[in-house]
Amino acid sequence: MPKNRQIRSIKLKEGKTNLTRISDLFFQIRLWGLDAQKRLRAARVLVAGMRGLGNEVTKNLVLAGVNSMTILDHENMTKEDCVSSFLAPTDHVGKNRAQASLERLKQRNPMVEVTADPDNLETKEEGFFKNFDVVIVTNYPKDVCLKVNKICRANNIK
């Protein structure tokens, strides 16, 4: 960094001081506009299924700056998961996929509230989904996806 350039630290709402986060926010506003960034920042997202696609989706949404992210998966990490699961350390084989992915996902953007749910999506009642604005389901059977889709459509959840 050039010597003549000063960087001022700005205190953010969450108490973090990090110019990079502010720079990222300004970039995102320029990228898709203030209204879209406000909607993203307010979004409560559920991603069910923490394999390759689920990992990529959660990473991108957390980096974009959603309000909160819940990752749900009832299965445990396998050696095969280590190939596509960049969020879960390889020494977490045998641990729940959602819980194994939690720490690295939180590190991607400390301003996003990230939680892990080790339950089975198939056991969730309709009221559970009402806690979210966006629900994304990956790696589940078609009948489960259709059931979740029906619940989300009935409750105006994206």
Residue ranges with predicted function:
Residues M1-K158:
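Adenine nucleotide-associated cytosolic modules
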